[in-house]
Amino acid sequence: MKKTKVINSDLSRVIATMGHFDKLSIGDAGMPVPSSTEKIDLAVDNGIPSFMQVLNNVLEELEVQRIYLAEEIKVQNPKMLTAIKKRLPDTPITFIPHEEMKKDLADCKAFVRTGEMTPYSNILLESGVTF
């Protein structure tokens, strides 16, 4: 059995294949995902698992050099924005319109669906390098 934090086989596989500048998205239960993007559906109930639980888990194994958030999170979900900034205090943030984020999902290695039920709880993680 795998000993590291990410034990979901699909999620672990995607993280293992990430290269520099590749993107992985984590999002709420309502985010529409293009059919061309792999969807790893972890949602089992409202709020389970939460966005932050999944983000924290992924960050145990993925080197992130930049994050992308919807501009709308600033007004519509400031608590989540604060939590993300606290978890990634030194990571540059680029804010983009939510509609642009939805389009950008087509360029992600995968989208990880959580059970999160709060607005604009979506993030694009840009992979960095560990050297």
From Swiss-Prot:
UniProt-annotated binding residues for substrate: 28, 98, 120-122
GO molecular function, one term: intramolecular lyase activity
Annotated GO biological process: D-ribose catabolic process
UniProt keyword list: Carbohydrate metabolism, Cytoplasm, Isomerase
EC number per UniProt: 5.4.99.62
Pfam families in alphabetical order: RbsD_FucU
A GO cellular-component term linked to this record: cytosol
Major site of localization recorded for this protein: cytoplasm
Catalytic reaction list: beta-D-ribopyranose = beta-D-ribofuranose
Pathway of action: Carbohydrate metabolism; D-ribose degradation; D-ribose 5-phosphate from beta-D-ribopyranose: step 1/2
InterPro entries: D-ribose_pyranase (IPR023064), RbsD-like_sf (IPR023750), RbsD_FucU (IPR007721)
Location within or outside the cell: Cytoplasm
Active-site residues (renumbered): 20 (proton donor)
Subunit structure: Homodecamer.
PANTHER family, per database record: D-RIBOSE PYRANASE
UniProt similarity note: Belongs to the RbsD / FucU family. RbsD subfamily.
Protein task: Catalyzes the interconversion of beta-pyran and beta-furan forms of D-ribose.
HAMAP family reported in the protein's UniProt record: D_rib_pyranase (MF_01661)
Annotated protein name in UniProt: D-ribose pyranase
Annotated organism of origin: Lactiplantibacillus plantarum (strain ATCC BAA-793 / NCIMB 8826 / WCFS1) (Lactobacillus plantarum)
Lineage: Bacteria, Bacillati, Bacillota, Bacilli, Lactobacillales
The encoding gene: rbsD
